[in-house]
């Protein structure tokens, strides 16, 4: 993963609202393309959600991240 891409995404996500972060997550549902930029994007997105105290366990187990389903934010928890 390219740290420059990660840092750029991390800075962008830090400035976003939680609603915007959830919308960004949902925008990735069904996207099967993968490269180093996508890896940086996904990691920065999940890291920002976790940094804000959001429970992401419905989509991330610490190793595997799933964009199989749209999510909603409910009581600071991502819910499928």
Feature roles, as predicted:
Residues 1-80:
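Extended, charge-rich alpha-helical interface modules
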């Amino acid at each position: 993963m390219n740290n420059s891409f990660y840092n750029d995404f991390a800075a962008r996500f830090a400035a976003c609202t939680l609603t915007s972060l959830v919308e960004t997550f949902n925008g990735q549902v069904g996207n099967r393309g993968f490269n180093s930029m996508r890896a940086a994007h996904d990691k920065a997105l999940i890291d920002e959600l976790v940094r804000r105290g959001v429970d992401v366990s419905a989509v991330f187990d610490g190793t595997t991240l799933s964009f199989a389903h749209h999510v909603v934010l409910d009581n600071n928890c991502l819910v499928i």
